[in-house]
Every structure is written in C-alpha cells, then in structure tokens.
Amino acid sequence: MGGVMFCSDADLSGDSVIFLAHQWNFFPGKQYTPSDFNEKSVTGGTFLTLGSFGNFSLGSTSEASNGTATYRLTLSLPDTARTYSLYLPEIFSAYTLYLNEEKVCSQGNPDLAHYKDLIGNKEISFTASGTVHITIIATNYSHIYSGITYPPAFGTVTAIQKYLSTRLFISGITLAAIFLFGACSLFFFCRLKHNNALVF
C-alpha cells in the first residue's frame, strides 16, 4: 500500500530488523512539516524506493540534483505500545526528523536561509503503537549525494543494538583483514627485493 508500511508482531519479533526502503512519499523542492500534512496542503509528491537514486533529480537531467525535499512514510505498528529504535544512516547533508507531530532531532540545519551541513549516523528510540508518521526534511548543497540514499533500519531496541554491534564487528574484521593483507604484501615484497639483491 502506497505510503504505509505494515509492521506486525511477527515482523518485529526476536532480532528482526526492518529496512525502511519502500513506500516513501517524496516531495522534491518542498519543505513540508507534519502540520502541512494534517491540513492536507501538500502537493507534487511521488512514491520512491530509497537507494534507487543518489540525489534529488531522480535520474532526470532536467531536474536539479541538489536542493531540498521532504520524505514521508507511515508505519502501522501493533496496538500494544512498545519501545522501538530508528537508525538513520548518513542523510545528505542536513535534515530534520519528525515523528508524528513532534520534532525529534536535526543534523545540521536544512532551512534554506540558514543551511548548514552535518553528516552523521543517528539512532532514535521512542515508544509507540498504532500509526506513526515519519517526516524528514532534507537539504543538500555541499555533497555529490542528496537526501536519503541508504534506508533507515527499524525494530525493537534490542534488535537495532544487535544489528549495529554486528555491523561494527564486521567492519572491524574487514579492516583487520585489509591491514593483514597489506602487511603480508609488504613483507613478501621486501623479502623478494632482498633475495634479488643477493642474486645480483
């Protein structure tokens, strides 16, 4: 269903993490707050799968890749209130996040008159049930990418913490493997160079 993601108890059980990639309402060139949606004054939206495009142009050569845009997604959660976590990867290059009507956080300043970029990851925990509207206003004038290019991760606090810990562990293993490969390459290069010097 367009604009709504249904999350059942089964979807949120155990260590399950839901990646919020699909069904986003996307409003390029607009900075809509929850009040605008409540008043039904929004126009010009389209549906978007995050990661399909790297900037606000949506692949069109006639549209600007930088600028501002609003993202909107509705979550349909179980009726029993629970504490959830929303993990936001890098959003380029400044944004404000609303949950329902509440302004929850900002990274940098997406306001066009006071734009300031600040890129970083963010984890938000909140208690909710039923319908939750996620509204994100993003602005970019300083990076090759624009807006939300990586889907947020959603789940219970425990599930998100385990997901982030696993990511960190894998990143650490990868860096260690790269370092070990580089050290071995340097060792064999020096060994080969030394042997060649002895031959000649």
Q: Where are each of the predicted segments found?
A:
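Hydrophobic residues positioned within well-ordered beta-strands of beta-sheet architectures
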Residues: 22, 71-73, 86, 122-124, ...
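Extended low-complexity, serine/threonine- and proline-enriched intrinsically disordered segments
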Residues: 22-28, 94-101
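Solvent-exposed loop and beta-edge segments used for protein-protein assembly and interaction
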Residues: 16, 65-69, 78-80, 87-91, ...
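Core alpha-helical transmembrane segments of integral membrane proteins
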Residues: 163-200
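Solvent-exposed beta-strand/loop surfaces of large extracellular or lumenal domains
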Residues: 41-51, 56-60, 102-122
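An acidic-aromatic loop/edge-strand motif
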Residues: 115-176
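Extended carbohydrate-recognition surfaces in non-catalytic/accessory domains of CAZymes
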Residues: 1-81
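Aromatic-lined ligand-binding clefts that engage carbohydrates, nucleic acids, or primary amines
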Residues: 75-100, 134-136
